[in-house]
Amino acid sequence: MLKAVILIGGPQKGTRFRPLSFEVPKPLFPVAGVPMIQHHIEACAQVPGMQEILLIGFYQPDEPLTQFLEAAQQEFNLPVRYLQEFAPLGTGGGLYHFRDQILAGSPEAFFVLNADVCSDFPLSAMLEAHRRQRHPFLLLGTTANRTQSLNYGCIVENPQTHEVLHYVEKPSTFISDIINCGIYLFSPEALKPLRDVFQRNQQDGQLEDSPGLWPGAGTIRLEQDVFSALAGQGQIYVHLTDGIWSQIKSAGSALYASRLYLSRYQDTHPERLAKHTPGGPWIRGNVYIHPTAKVAPSAVLGPNVSIGKGVTVGEGVRLRESIVLHGATLQEHTCVLHSIVGWGSTVGRWARVEGTPSDPNPNDPRARMDSESLFKDGKLLPAITILGCRVRIPAEVLILNSIVLPHKELSRSFTNQIIL
């Protein structure tokens, strides 16, 4: 028996994802046509012996999240439950707080996946590796170049046994080109070190004149409090993958993740990819079109385009490297490149909405997405263009490298701007 836990965070996280996270929780943002964490759930559901999937986070269980859980249970015929933390507890605190729920039924092991990663999720391969050695912690690792490795948790392994000898979260100097993917497989014994951290936090925070539990004791950081502390003690091992992997920290990285997932659909979900048919729009490369979307026959879509529910795409529209969300309208002859068009937004005829791609260096096979700040030296860095919810763009204007917050009605062109 196996279980899976998906760590979805809370509203205080994902600030780099704004304005898109204003409308839906970041884990429910559509990537390649389906909510971000549906890719995780699909991968978990395919593992033989999977009995339950738990989501742990600090979001309020609102209507979108509740509807998603109900739909996921129906589609995958598995219990999918949300466990809400009483406070943000870090990457390990929720696991310890809900340990009884996780261990109910005595699972052999349980997967732990961060919601904000894009991957092909080699969970079956991880399970095979775990069953060969049965150590408490198994981490999925991949490689990054020397410079970008400093932005991740870095792993020094024994190349023969794959034991993690040293772990440093976001080191200041180069440690290793092997990085933590945020995807783990834990045995039930893995919760014992979390208990030790909780008890140590309790002792450190306990005041002599304040009996009772210290409220901060439940905050546990897997990476710093557990992995770094236990590295080199024969408890943590790494399983390396050369498959697709990327973090989804910003809107630009969501667009890149959409491309990766759309390319995987050729093997995993070919039915989700649009095909060129007589009388239909021109399709170039990998494109997802929701069945309820209305797309004019003269529109040209792709590559890497995702069109959501109820979208209207007019005659002569050109769409490339973009996500168009639920209910948006692209009027005749608009051009949308490297952009995300928000829910219910309208782009007027002959308007152009364009961003600058922020993809990894194509000449470096180990390059990863950079999650840089929006600004450098007081100037907005060129990046993809984002239109928030219900933005109205007039006809014949250019919106370039800009972020438009929700419910704005523009009257002219903008370049390199954040429109508040």
UniProtKB/Swiss-Prot annotation:
Hexapeptide repeat domain: annotated span: 273-420
GO CC terms: cytoplasm; cytosol; extracellular exosome; GDP-mannose pyrophosphorylase complex
Effect of E396R: Disrupts the interaction with other GMPPA molecules but not with GMPPB
Phenotype upon changing Q247D: Does not instate mannose-1-phosphate guanylyltransferase catalytic activity
Stretches the record annotates as Substrate-binding domain: 2-251
Superkingdom classification of source: Eukaryota
One GO MF term attached to the UniProt entry: enzyme inhibitor activity
Effect caused by changing E372A: Reduces the efficiency of GMPPB allosteric inhibition
Pfam family for this entry, one: GMPPB_C
The record's note on its domains: The N-terminal substrate-binding domain adopts a Rossman-like fold and has a binding pocket for GTP or GDP-alpha-D-mannose. The C-terminal domain consists of a series of tandem hexapeptide repeats that adopt a beta-helix conformation. The beta-helix forms several protein interaction surfaces involved in assembly of the GMPPA-GMPPB mannose-1-phosphate guanylyltransferase complex. A loop extending from the C-terminal domain (C-loop) is involved in interaction with other subunits of the GMPPA-GMPPB complex and may be involved in allosteric inhibition of GMPPB catalytic activity by GMPPA.
Homology family: Belongs to the transferase hexapeptide repeat family.
Function: Regulatory subunit of the GMPPA-GMPPB mannose-1-phosphate guanylyltransferase complex; reduces the catalytic activity of GMPPB when part of the complex. Mediates allosteric feedback inhibition of GMPPB catalytic activity upon binding GDP-alpha-D-mannose. Together with GMPPB regulates GDP-alpha-D-mannose levels.
This protein's name: Mannose-1-phosphate guanylyltransferase regulatory subunit alpha
Taxonomic lineage: Eukaryota, Metazoa, Chordata, Craniata, Vertebrata
Gene name for this UniProt entry: GMPPA
